[in-house]
């Protein structure tokens, strides 16, 4: 069973979805039964835009951070849709999407400078997947 569509989730519905949840924010966002439509390729930049570390516990997020996260989800998914979707997906006519790894802000950019602060983007392990973070823009504590 899929959760609600991530794109366009309302400013009331999103906090309600997170209320009382345990676990880390990245794991929650990747679970399609919680929120449908966010793949691992998008998650790095969504969390970066919201300035949230992927290992942050959901219960520690402030209302302001939750709203920033909701806005980052909308912005990142809308940007991909405007470009025809992700490069690894095809449309009904077999045409691949135009949103490529080169369009990502920090995703898959380990060792490169952060586009906001210049710190080095790091690759960290988050459960069964890896995640790219800026240690300055997305502090864990």
Label each PLM-derived region with a short phrase:
Residues 114-117, 134-137:
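Short cysteine-rich clusters marking metal-coordination/redox-active sites
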Residues 121-122, 139:
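Short functional micro-motifs and their immediate structural scaffolds
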Residues 1-49, 57:
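Phosphate/anion-contacting hairpin/loop surfaces
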Residues 32, 110-111, 131:
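Residues immediately within or flanking Cys/His clusters that coordinate Zn2+
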Residues 92-104, 115-119:
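Short Cys/His-rich Zn2+-coordinating modules
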Residues 101-110, 124-127:
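Short, flexible, mixed-charge glycine/proline-rich loop motifs
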Residues 51-60, 66:
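RNA substrate-recognition surfaces in RNA-acting enzymes
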Residues 65-82:
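Basic, amphipathic alpha-helical segments enriched in Lys/Arg and hydrophobic/aromatic residues
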């Amino acid at each position: 069973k899929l959760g609600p569509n991530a794109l366009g989730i309302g400013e009331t519905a999103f906090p309600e979805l997170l209320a009382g949840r345990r676990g880390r924010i990245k794991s929650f966002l990747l679970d399609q039964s919680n929120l449908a439509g966010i793949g691992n390729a998008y998650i790095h930049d969504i969390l970066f835009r919201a300035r949230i570390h992927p290992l942050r516990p959901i219960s520690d997020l402030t209302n302001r951070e939750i709203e920033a996260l909701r806005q980052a989800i909308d912005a990142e998914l809308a940007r991909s849709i405007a470009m025809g979707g992700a490069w690894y997906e095809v449309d009904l006519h077999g045409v691949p999407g135009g949103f490529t790894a080169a369009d990502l802000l920090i995703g898959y950019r380990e060792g490169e400078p952060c586009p906001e602060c210049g710190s080095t983007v790091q690759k960290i392990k988050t459960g069964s997947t890896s995640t790219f973070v800026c240690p300055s823009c997305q502090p864990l504590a």
